């Protein structure tokens, strides 16, 4: 029996960087959008998780040097640790200087989706893009850099390694290279 593999949309790291670079680092919406995209790509959070963050819980995190870890309750009520890159923290800090709301990102998931599509289009990205694509993009980037799929699974908060196997499109070319090196 042949099973159909689920295909996923993802962006190359350079495409994510192109989207971020296309957002001017000034103005309320620009700073919010830049911070949200940096957070989504840096942490691999689901959009619902990112939109639930509060400004107050971010402030202590921003004072730490380098990459910062942060525990969240994700899908299904499971706790996992996420990591904010220095670039994401810098973008959050710039946004917090203007944002006075309790929520870090006081927008709806639909608003976030429209924003991501608009920003990708402005950057010349023609692939299908959604907030969740940044999660797929991070997972793909980690695997391309040689991170073990079991660690990627834990990073994403997957309860089963099978959930992470949708990224096997990345692992397969690497397996071919490993095989070539081992069996010359």
Give, region by region, the residue ranges found by the protein language model.
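Conserved catalytic core of the tyrosine transesterase superfamily
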Residues: 1-184
């Amino acid at each position: 029996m042949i099973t159909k593999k689920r295909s996923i949309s993802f962006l190359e790291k350079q495409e994510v960087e192109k989207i971020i670079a296309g957002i001017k680092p000034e103005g309320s919406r620009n700073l919010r959008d830049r911070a949200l995209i940096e957070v989504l790509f840096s942490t691999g959070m689901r959009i619902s998780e990112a939109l639930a963050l509060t400004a107050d819980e971010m402030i202590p995190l921003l004072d730490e040097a380098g990459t910062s870890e942060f525990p969240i309750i994700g899908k299904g009520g499971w706790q996992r640790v996420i990591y904010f890159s220095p670039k994401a923290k810098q973008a959050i800090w710039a946004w917090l200087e203007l944002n006075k709301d309790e929520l870090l990102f006081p927008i709806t998931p639909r608003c976030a989706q429209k924003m991501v599509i608009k920003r990708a289009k402005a950057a010349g990205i023609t692939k299908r893009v959604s907030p969740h694509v940044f999660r797929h993009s991070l997972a793909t980037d980690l695997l391309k850099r040689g991170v073990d799929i079991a660690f990627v699974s834990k990073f994403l908060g997957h309860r089963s390694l099978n959930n992470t196997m949708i990224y096997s499109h990345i692992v397969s070319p690497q397996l071919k290279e490993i095989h070539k090196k081992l069996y010359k």
